[in-house]
Amino acid sequence: MTEEELHAEASRILKALLARRQLKHADLADALSRVGVNESVSSIKGKLHRGTFSFAWMLACCKALGLSKITLDDDSV
C-alpha cells in the first residue's frame, strides 16, 4: 500500500467508528476533551479529511469512544 492509501484507510476506519455509533465530529471533540485531549471540531474534520494523524491520536480517539479492543479487520471495525 502507498502512504496515501494508508492515510485514506486510517481516515475511513475512524469515520466508520463514528458512523456506527451515530456520532458527529462535535461528539468526538467532547469525548476527547473528557480524556484530556483538546481538539476543535474543525481540527478533527481536517485530520479525518487528510487522514494524517498519529497513531497516538487514533488511540486517544478509541479510548474517548470507549473502545477496549482494536482490530484491523474491516469486518470488525
Region roles according to the model:
Residues 13, 27, 56-60:
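Short Gly/charged-rich anion-binding patches and loops
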Residues 21, 32, 36-37, 65:
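Core residues of bacterial helix-turn-helix
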Residues 1-24, 30-31, 70:
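A short, Lys/Arg-rich alpha-helix, primarily the initiator
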